[in-house]
């Protein structure tokens, strides 16, 4: 059963108003601001926001094996305190456009290049406190080559059948949100094509 919460009509589409913003941290990958805002409800609030230049995620699909296979990376993530299976991804450098960043990240981390690219999703990583927009690209027509990961990246790369990756999501073996988004998107596309035959 769905529940609907009614909002006051005058506040429904209004935004919070920024009263002040102070940078409290600046590092090589992101900065943090402490913002004072006036919420649409009229309440003053402090919001600590991680400011990020944005990221790209690559759903690299090999369609030459009968069933689609997706390229996943396994690497240790200190914040999660564990190894995670993930789609290739990375930060957009300042001044860089998302598509060139996606092509660069796929080649650096996996060695693969792709002939066909399409942006399929655009979403926020964790909008409660992180200002990081992510663009998810579908990459097809893959060609293998040498990887050039950064010095601090130890990445194991492997193709998984889409069916297996979807099971990994449902079992919690894939626990990374951007990867879950990509796997579910491709699973839905495959189901839609199957139904329309």
Model region roles, listed by residue range:
Residues 20-59, 65:
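Acidic, metal-coordinating catalytic segment for phosphate/diphosphate chemistry
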Residues 6-26:
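Extended interaction-bearing regions that mediate binding to partners or small molecules
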Residues 166-197:
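Long hydrophobic alpha-helical segments typical of transmembrane helices together
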Residues 45, 54-57, 91-177:
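Unchanged
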Residues 31-35, 83, 133-135:
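Short beta-strand micro-motifs in enzyme catalytic cores
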Residues 8-9, 13-15, 66-104, 108, ...:
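Conserved Nudix-box catalytic region and its N-terminal flanking loop in Nudix hydrolases
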Residues 41, 62-65, 76, 140-144, ...:
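Short loop segments at secondary-structure junctions
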